[in-house]
C-alpha cells in the first residue's frame, strides 16, 4: 500500500500534517474555475441591465457554494488561509463591477451588500454547532464535540467556535442554543455577523482616503446596483466614481508626476474638474452655462442625482476619448510618439482596468 501525505475524502483534502494548506490551495483553484464558469455564462447570455445583479447571484450560488463546501467543519483554519480565499472572491467582485485593482476592499462589499468569506464561514460554523447540539448525546458527532470541549488543543474546531462567539458577542451557552429553534438562532447569528462586518468596513474606511464618503450603516446593495434605469456600463462607471478609481491623474497620485489635466492643462485632473474642463464640455450643448452648478458629490446622493450625474460623466468621458483619438490621428508618422505630458489634448491613462465585463445593455 502506497503512503501519501494528502488524501481527498468527501470533497476535502486530508493532510497527515494536520493542516489545511493543501485543502485551501485546492479550494482556491476551484474558485478560479468557478470564476471562469461565471464569466463564460455572463458573456454568452444577454443579461442586459441586470448583468451585475445576476453576477452577484451567481457569486452566491456557484462560487461560494464550491469554495466553501464543508467549510463548517474545517479545523486549524488560519487567518492567512481565509485571506487566500478572500483574494479569489475579490477577483470575482472586481470583475463583476469592472473595478480597478486599487479599489479599496470596503467599497466592493459595501456597494454590493455582500459578506466576505470569513463572515460566511462563521455563519456556517455556528449553524453547524446548532446542528451538533440538536443531536442525541449518544451520537458520535455529539460525543466528539464534548471530548474536544475537555481538551485544550490549539486549532480544534471547538476553539474556533469559542473564538467566533467572543468576536461576535454571542453570549449563549450550549444549553441556551439547544433551547432555541434553528430559525431563531440563524437569525441571531446573521444579525451579529452583519453588525461585526459593518464595523470592520468602517474601520477600513478610516484608513483609506478613497473611502472618505463611504456610508455603510446597513449591509445591502446600493440602490443604483438594482435600478433598471441605469445600464451596466453606467453602473460600473458610477462605482468607479464613488470609489475614486476613475482614470484621472489625482486618483492615482503615485503614478503621475504632473497632476495637470491632459485635456486642457488649466487645472489638476480630478473627477470634479472633468465637469468643468472646457475642451470636454464645450460640445455638450445641454451643459452650456450650467457647469458651475454641477455637483460632483451627487455620486453619493440619492438615486435621481446619481442617474443624472453619471449620464453627464458618461458623455464627458466620450468627449475625452474623441479628443484623444483626434490628437493621435493628427500626429505625423515621421514625428514618432509624443509623450502625453508634452501636449494639451493628450489623455494619459493612469492605469489599466481589469477585464471588462461584456454584457449587452
What do these predicted regions represent?
Residues 34, 156-159, 293:
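Surface polyanion/phosphate-binding segment centered on an Asp-His-Pro turn
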Residues 40-48, 204-207, 211-361:
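Family-specific functional microsites
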Residues 1-3, 99, 257-262:
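Short, hydrophobic/aliphatic alpha-helical segments
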Residues 4, 106, 264-266:
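A generic hydrophobic-helix recognition signal that picks specific residues
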Residues 6-143, 148:
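Non-catalytic, peripheral interaction segments enriched in hydrophobic/basic residues
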Residues 60, 88-89, 100-245, 249, ...:
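Extended C-terminal regions of large enzymes
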Amino acid at each position: 500500500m502506497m503512503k501519501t501525505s494528502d488524501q481527498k475524502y468527501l470533497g476535502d483534502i486530508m493532510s497527515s500534517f494536520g493542516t489545511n494548506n493543501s485543502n485551501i490551495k485546492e479550494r482556491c483553484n476551484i474558485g478560479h474555475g468557478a470564476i471562469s464558469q461565471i464569466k463564460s455564462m455572463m458573456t454568452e447570455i444577454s443579461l442586459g441591465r441586470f448583468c451585475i445583479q445576476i453576477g452577484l447571484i451567481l457569486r452566491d450560488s456557484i462560487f461560494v457554494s464550491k469554495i466553501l463546501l464543508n467549510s463548517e467543519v474545517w479545523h486549524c483554519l488560519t487567518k492567512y488561509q481565509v485571506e487566500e480565499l478572500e483574494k479569489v472572491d475579490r477577483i470575482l467582485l472586481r470583475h463583476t463591477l469592472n473595478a480597478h485593482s486599487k479599489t479599496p476592499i470596503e467599497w466592493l462589499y459595501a456597494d454590493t451588500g455582500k459578506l466576505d468569506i470569513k463572515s460566511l464561514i462563521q455563519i456556517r460554523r455556528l449553524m453547524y454547532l446548532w446542528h451538533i447540539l440538536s443531536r442525541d448525546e449518544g451520537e458520535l458527532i455529539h460525543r466528539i464535540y464534548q471530548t474536544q470541549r475537555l481538551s485544550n488543543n490549539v486549532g480544534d474546531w471547538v476553539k474556533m467556535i469559542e473564538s467566533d462567539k467572543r468576536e461576535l458577542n454571542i453570549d449563549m451557552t450550549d444549553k441556551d442554543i439547544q433551547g432555541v429553534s434553528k430559525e431563531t438562532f440563524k437569525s441571531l447569528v446573521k444579525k451579529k455577523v452583519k453588525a461585526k462586518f459593518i464595523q470592520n468596513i468602517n474601520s477600513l474606511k478610516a484608513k483609506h482616503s478613497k473611502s472618505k464618503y463611504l456610508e455603510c450603516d446597513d449591509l445591502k446593495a446600493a440602490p443604483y446596483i438594482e435600478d433598471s434605469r441605469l445600464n451596466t456600463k453606467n453602473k460600473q462607471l458610477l462605482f468607479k466614481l464613488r470609489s475614486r478609481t476613475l482614470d484621472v491623474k489625482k486618483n492615482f497620485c503615485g503614478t503621475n508626476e504632473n497632476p495637470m489635466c491632459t485635456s486642457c492643462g488649466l487645472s489638476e485632473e480630478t473627477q470634479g474638474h472633468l465637469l468643468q474642463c472646457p475642451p470636454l464640455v464645450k460640445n455638450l450643448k445641454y451643459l452650456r452655462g450650467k457647469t458651475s452648478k454641477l455637483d460632483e458629490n451627487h455620486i453619493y446622493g440619492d438615486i435621481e442625482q446619481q442617474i443624472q450625474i453619471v449620464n453627464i460623466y458618461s458623455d464627458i468621458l466620450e468627449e475625452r476619448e474623441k479628443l484623444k483619438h483626434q490628437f493621435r490621428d493628427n500626429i505625423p508618422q515621421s514625428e514618432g510618439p509624443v509623450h502625453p505630458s508634452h501636449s494639451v489634448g493628450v489623455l494619459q491613462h493612469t492605469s489599466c482596468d481589469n477585464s471588462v465585463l461584456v454584457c449587452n445593455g
